Structures are given as structure tokens and as C-alpha cells.
Amino acid sequence: MFCEQCEQTASGNGCHQWGACGKSPEVNAVQDLLIYCLRGLATVVLKARENHIPTQKMDVFICEALFATMTNVNFNNKSLTEYLKTCINLREKLKQTLEETLNTPPSWSDLSNYQPDWEDSLVTQGETLVHRFISRSSNDLDIISLKLTVLYGLKGVASYTFHAQELGQEDEKVYQFIEDALVKLERTDLSLQEWIDLALKVGEINLRAMELLDAGHTQTYGHPTPTQVPLNPKKGKAILVSGHDIRQLEAILQQTADKDITVYTHGELLPAHGYPKLKQNYPHLYGHYGTAWQNQTKDFAKFPGAIIITTNCLMPPHETYDEKLFTIGPVSYPHLTYLPPTETGIPDYSPAIKKACLMPGFTEETEPRHVMVGFARNTVLSVSDQVIEGVKTGKIRHFFLVGGCDGAKPGRTYYTELVEKVPSDCIVLTLACGKFRFFDKQLGEIEGLPRLMDVGQCNDAYSAIQIALGLANAFNVSVNEIPLSLILSWYEQKAIAVLLTLLYLGIQNIRLGPTLPAFITPNVLQFLQDNYHLQPITTPDEDLAACLN
């Protein structure tokens, strides 16, 4: 087994016996086999696009299948094998179409001709291919590092692209880049600089993918507005929806309307409460339950209703709650109930609804608690004059963007302590599940502006970027000259894609933690430090002093 795509990878240098996420070596090997076959499909799709043959079905499939190989998404070899079979079927049908259409049939590479041996061990085949992937990168560890950076970043781009197309937002250039980059991973002739350029291109395309998803959310549900979200449950039957997929959350709300079931969000779906059309159209979307993904074994065990996982992060479930747990889309785990999509792409959620009706639900009220969400770009930039005046008069000294992924490592308490120690004349922007380290802190206000503003999900890094660019334009300076410090936490591959976007934009002095990626070699890290001043977090006191100096 070889996997080092997440922050919690074993001993900080890769998982070789069993995944720290709970992924078995067998699942890891089949994921590697799937990725290899997706690269072969991408080769054929690029040829089809050159010849004006429709590829949208394959484009979306590649994104979903890459999504399935992300951390804490799919632990089920049966499900992954179905993705693998679909991949080969789509590839062969498209090859046949090309051969029948073109006067001169294409000459296919080994990559696009690879045929898994269904009678033999898929695990062994996957292990062989990943070893070949490494060996074909020669002995240059820096090139291997950058190849892995590109691959992991592509997974993040694919996940955002998949969600955006659910909401009707697509850009063929995004699909084409994903496929072209997948094929380039087979190249052995690219220089170190060319791999650096490709990694930064991943960041550029991810910016576009996040823009598409932002458009899908805001055009469908309206721009987020400041909204108070209850953290205390109310009496009645309940369904908990976890993950990131707001389109599927809406589908669940539609299918539970008039059924006297209260719907709660979990994890990265907290920002959904800020979208006005969701709140207006579905009054049974009530509150938020639980905190970040790594606490789900405790949160899910206590929740007295059905639970639906729409995306990452799924942990191996305990038997105390696995019977009330349902998965959809790319998410799968052996023995959990999977709800397949219908022709519309929306599952029939009846099994989860029936389970919720059979369960006790919440039987008593608790003391009211709440948090605020909805401070996306429209909200913040609508008061830009007030913000600018606050900075000019010295009432606002500095902005901190403290966000990213949460995780189980003890070192992540750094982020809680840092936010608690941020001076009272500074504002904290946050996004993604890293916020759960401090999302309920009462930090007060500066001149009517909340000192803690939740910008949204991890993909709302796009919104945070627009806020930073808007402030920079207002002050007539570059982003690196405004009083803003980025202190980020990472865990999985979406965070890698977002980091590459920030580097593509030339943003300097990012502090990253709790540890640096295992797949980044010392030479690549030195390049990032020399050119972008990227640095690991130290202590809250030291980093605050450096940022405010």
C-alpha cells in the first residue's frame, strides 16, 4: 500500500499498512487501478473532443469517479469495481465510435487499451500499476512530488466540478484540462519547471471550478445573507444531512416536505442555512447538529433519526448507528444502505425517510444556542465602505482568514487558541470545517461588524478570494499589501486544490498546518518558501506577533 494524499497519513510519511482514514490496502489498490483506467478513458475523450464527438457523459463520470478516490469518500471495493467497469465500458464504446467515424482509425496507446483481468485480483493489478507510476517518474523525488500534487489537486477540482454540474454549471475547458492533466501524468519527458507550471495550472482551473459552483449556488438559492442557525434541536422526527452537496440537501427537503420531519445539517452543510431561497422554501430546514467530521462517531451515535452522507467526510461507521446511515453519489461503505441516483441524478430518499419515521426523534427541547452564517462576498463587500473606514481610522487593525479542513490531530488546537488570542481590533474570517474549532465563540463586534464571519464551505474560498480582491481594489493595492493574513488548516484533496489556487494567484505568506503535506519534498518546499513565503504554523503567539508586526 502507498498513500500519502491526506494530512493524517501515518507517521507523516505515508500509509503503507493501513490507511489512517480507515481505508484498507485492498481498497487503496482498486482506487489506484481506477485512476489508471480513468487516465486511459481521458486519452480517448480528448481524441473524441478533437473530432467534435460529444463527451459530456464521460466528462461528468471522470469527475465523479475521481471524487470516489478522495479521502473519506468510498471504502467499498464493490462500488469501486462498478466505477471501474463503467470506465472501461465508456472507453470502449467511445473508441468504437471514433473508429467508425474517422477515415483513419486512431492508434491507441497502452494506457487507452489497458484491460483489467476481471478473473484475477484487481488488488494485485492496482498495486502493480501504482508501483509502475512511481518507477516511471525515474528517481527524481521532486518530480514524483509534483506529479502527486497534480493528481491530488485534480481530485479536488473534480469534486467541485461534479457539484457545479449538478446545478447546471459546466465549462468544457475545465473538463478538458482535467483529462489532459490525467494523461500528462503518464509523461516522463517533462521538466521540473513544467510540472511546477502544471501544478499552478491546476490552481487556475480550480478557481474556475469554484466560480462555477458559486454561480450554481447563488443563482439557484440566492446570495447568502447573515442568518442565525440554531444549534439546539427541537422535538420531533429528524433527518441529519452531512457532507457538502447543497443540491442533494434541497432534494431531501423536497421529499420530506409535509412529512413532519425536521431536517438538520451536519459538517460542511452548515453554510446552507445562509441561502435565502432554501430557508424561504423549506421551513423544516431548522438547525445544525454536531461539529466537524472527525467527531461523527459521537454525533451520529446520539442522533435519534436517519443520517444521509452526501460527500466526504465519512469515517468507518460504528455498529451503534450504521443501520440509520445512508450514502449517495460517490460515497460508499460496505454494509451501509446506498441510495442510487434515478435518471434525474436525484436518489429516492424514501428508505431514509421511513427510517426517520420509525426512530424516536428528539423528545425534548434544550437550551437555545445559535451561530451566525452567511458572510459571503456579497454581504462583506456590501459594507466595504464601512470596512475601509474602519481600517483607515485604525479601528480595524488586521484581518485573519483562519479556515480549511479540520481533523483529529491534537495540534489542531492551535487554531482555537489563535482565534481566542486575536486582538479585539481584528476581524476573523473563516470557512470550511476548520471553523468548528471556534465557530461558536462570541468575539463581539467592531463598529457594528461581527469580529467572526463565516464565509461558507471550503469551495467558498472563491468568495473569500473575491473579498480580498475587492478590498485590495478599494485600497488600490495588491492583495499581498492589504492587512490580511491567511492561516490555513488542511486535510484532504480539496484543500490541496484551494492551496494551488492561492499560489496561482500569487498570494504570499500563507501559514499552513497542522503539518505540511507528506508528498512535498524538501526541494519543492524550498521552492514554495522562496517564491511564495509559504510557511508552517508555529505557535499562536509567535504567528500572531509576526502577522501583526
Curated annotation (Swiss-Prot):
Its EC number is 1.7.99.1. One of its GO terms (cellular component) is cytoplasm. InterPro entries: HCP/CODH, Hydroxylam_reduct, Prismane-like_a/b-sand, Prismane-like_sf, Prismane_a-bundle. Its cofactor is [4Fe-4S] cluster; hybrid [4Fe-2O-2S] cluster. Hybrid [4Fe-2O-2S] cluster binds at H244, E268, C313, C405, C433, C458, E492, K494. It is an enzyme of class 1 (oxidoreductase). Belongs to the HCP family. PANTHER family: HYDROXYLAMINE REDUCTASE. HAMAP family: Hydroxylam_reduct. Catalyzes the reduction of hydroxylamine to form NH(3) and H(2)O. This is Hydroxylamine reductase. It comes from Gloeothece citriformis (strain PCC 7424).
